[in-house]
Amino acid sequence: MSISASMVKTLRERTGAGMMDCKQALEEANGDMEKAIDWLRQRGLSKASKKAGRATTEGLIGCQVLPGSTSAVLVEVMCETDFVSRDEVFKKFVDDIVSQLVANFHNNDVDLLDQPSGNKNLSIRDLLNETIATIGENIVIGRSIKMELTPGKNGMIGHYVHTNGKIAVLVELATETKETASSPKFQELAKNIAMQIAATAPLALNSESLDPLKIDREREVYRQKALEEGKPENMIEKIVEGAVKKYLKEVCLLDQPYIRDDKLSIAELIKKVSNEIGEPISIIEFVRIQLGEE
């Protein structure tokens, strides 16, 4: 397969590897981008892990938690420059979109752009076009997310938005009683876990909920890397399993060290607060979005 300059450029942007290394990786992978990334990682040539999560698109993520903290919304709105993302007109537009999502929380049948804005004479689409004309930059409404407390459960939706508005998190915590769900200690736990998710970008709650194919892919990368480094044959499986264990500790929320006290894992933190409160606490789900990420 012929390897184009644009393919090399894309791989270089995704991994940070050298141009010739990217070209060789694509040739070895017969043009398959994901296999080329693995080829680079196996040889220690990829810087993708350092670049993961870096989003270049400007804009803001709007967030609003409804009264009682039993539901919340996030919406990603992108623009072209950081200057516009700090403009009051743009910020008001983001607030209007969030308010519309809240007002129509249970209405999933009508496209967001076709819903009325705060100005009843304008749809969201009209308001978008009007804001683009006012600001002079293209604006794109990206992902919108709604999270609601699981029916029949007591708990709350914790949230955290990074101060620059580029990362936002929602997390559902459950407990036994409404009294506990409204207690300061429970609410503080929800906030701290949301901050943890924002800072560490976990891929799953635990290893059981992580895609097995992703674990298999990591295992194969570590195995090939060990072979490339000439590790003893009888040590390779032990090295691979150690690397996989470390990987799971990094990407599974419950296994991660707590950012405010790394002597505790998140699972241990939850158990500690559960014991203090006298009721079991569990994380049901979470979502983390970073501006411009796919």
Curated annotation (Swiss-Prot):
Signal peptide: none annotated. Residues 81-84 are annotated as: Involved in Mg(2+) ion dislocation from EF-Tu. Pfam families: EF_TS. InterPro entries: EF-Ts_dimer_sf, Transl_elong_EFTs/EF1B, Transl_elong_EFTs/EF1B_dimer, Transl_elong_Ts_CS, UBA-like_sf. One of its GO terms (molecular function) is translation elongation factor activity. The keyword Acetylation does not apply. Keywords: Cytoplasm, Elongation factor, Protein biosynthesis. GO terms for cellular component: cytoplasm. It is found in: Cytoplasm. The keyword Protein biosynthesis applies. Associates with the EF-Tu.GDP complex and induces the exchange of GDP to GTP. It remains bound to the aminoacyl-tRNA.EF-Tu.GTP complex up to the GTP hydrolysis stage on the ribosome. PANTHER family: ELONGATION FACTOR TS (PTHR11741), ELONGATION FACTOR TS, MITOCHONDRIAL (PTHR11741:SF0). This is Elongation factor Ts. It comes from Lawsonia intracellularis (strain PHE/MN1-00).
